[in-house]
Amino acid sequence: MATLEQMLDVGVHFGHQARKWNPKMAPYIFGERKGIHILDILQTAILLDKARVYARRQAASNGSFLFVGTKNQAASIVRFAAERCQKNDRSQAHYVNHRWLGGMLTNWPTMQLCIKRLLELESNHERGGFQQFPKKEAAVARKQLARLEKHLGGVKNMTGLPTTVVIVGQPQEMNAVRECEKLGIPMITMLDSDCNPLLTDIGIPSNDDSIASIELVMREITKGIEEGQWIQKEGREEATIEIEWFVVEPTPVEKPLVIIEPPPVEKPVLSK
C-alpha cells in the first residue's frame, strides 16, 4: 500500500483552482492554498485501500475490469494497467484510451459485431491476405483495420460486459459513467476537486491531472487485481471471504466550503 509520504511526493493531494470545484466534493477537501483546493490525503489513503481490496475480491471471483481514461495524461497509463493485468488472464482486463464510442456497453451486441470484424481483419492481415486483394480494396481494408484497432483494440478480448469499470477523468468520461449507471456496473473513480462523488461506487479523492498521481493510483488498483488473480488461480479460501472495511465516508454537503475565522480575542482591561 502506498504511504502518505509517497502520495504527497507525487502530488495526489492537489486539486483544481477553487473557482472550478464541484461543491459536492466539499467533504473530501482539506482546505485551500493560493487559490488551489487541497484534497484530504487521509481519506485518499483510506479509499484507495478500499478500492484495492474491492479489486482483489472481484478478481478473485473471476470478475473483469474495464479501465477508461482518454485524456492525454491518462491514456498510456490505463493501457499499461490493463495490459499488466492481462498477463495472467487476457479476458479479465480491458481498456478504452482513445475515445468512448456511444453504446460501448449499452449497445454491446453491436460492439461485438465490430470486434468480430476487427479480429477477422487482424487474422487476414497476419496471414498476408491483404496482398491478394486489389490495390484499392487492400487500402480500404488497412484503413478499416487501423480505425477499428484505434477505437476497439483495448476491448477486443472482452467477451461480455465488465463487472467493474475504473474511471480516470470523470468530467471527460461522462458518457461512460452514464452507461455504467444505466446498466448498474460498479465504478472505481479518481475524484479530483471538479468531480461528482455521487456518480461512483468507490471514489478516490486524487489529482487526476498529474501523470505521477494517476500512475500511483492505477498501480495500487492493478496490484489488487493481480492479488485476486493469484488467489483465484491457487483456489485459496480467501477468494470467498467477505471483507469489511473501516471507512469514514462523510455525507456530501451541497453548500460551498466556508472557512470561518475565529473572532479576535480582546485583551482584558486592567484596573489601576
UniProtKB/Swiss-Prot annotation:
InterPro entries: Ribosomal_uS2 (IPR001865), Ribosomal_uS2_bac/mit/plastid (IPR005706), Ribosomal_uS2_CS (IPR018130), Ribosomal_uS2_flav_dom_sf (IPR023591). Its main location: plastid. One of its GO terms (biological process) is translation. PANTHER family: 30S RIBOSOMAL PROTEIN S2 PROKARYOTIC AND ORGANELLAR (PTHR12534), SMALL RIBOSOMAL SUBUNIT PROTEIN US2M (PTHR12534:SF0). GO terms for molecular function: structural constituent of ribosome. It is found in: Plastid, Chloroplast. Belongs to the universal ribosomal protein uS2 family. This is Small ribosomal subunit protein uS2c. Signal peptide: none annotated. One of its GO terms (cellular component) is mitochondrial small ribosomal subunit. Keywords: Chloroplast, Plastid, Ribonucleoprotein, Ribosomal protein.
